[in-house]
Amino acid sequence: MNKAIFLDRDGTINVDKNYLYKIEDWEFIDGVIEGLQILQRLGFKLIVITNQSGIARGYYTEEDAHKIFDYMIKELEKNNIKIEKVYYCPHIGDECNCRKPKLGLFYKAQKDFDIDFSKSYAIGDKVRDLAICDKENIKGFLLNEDEKIENPRIQVCKNLLESAKIIEKRNG
């Protein structure tokens, strides 16, 4: 079985600009490249799981979403970082099982990549990004120092690089 890092996108990898879909608006958060390189070097599969309700709201199309996903993947590849896959929910509301905090996309990724949750981590800037930590034996990092969280498996950090360095100390 494999170990993975489940990454949120907006506010975790890139600067959160509401309903981002234009390449010219893309901006990596400082330290993301270095953090992802550390995690990849440790043997983690890097998997993005993101809510993209802007599609259902009509702000942009699925094609627009795929263009920005492809751009992100190509930019990371320039730094020898491989994103295994981007899983996304295009819906609004609770009618589906794929919109975080629901766990459908996590379980799909687990099946697709033979992931051992007990050796994996989830990283996101919102509590809903880490709902998997409540249901499975997976550790998480909340990249929002203003949030308070009671789950002992979740640690608050300021950014992805800080969380990667903590994971490196635990797994290095």
What are these regions, as identified by a protein language model?
Residues 1-45:
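Active-site neighborhood of HAD-like aspartate-dependent phosphohydrolases
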Residues 17, 22, 54-59, 92-96, ...:
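A short acidic, helix-capping loop that chelates divalent metal ions and anchors anionic groups
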Residues 7-9, 50, 124-125:
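Active-site flanking residues adjacent to catalytic metal/cofactor-binding acidic residues
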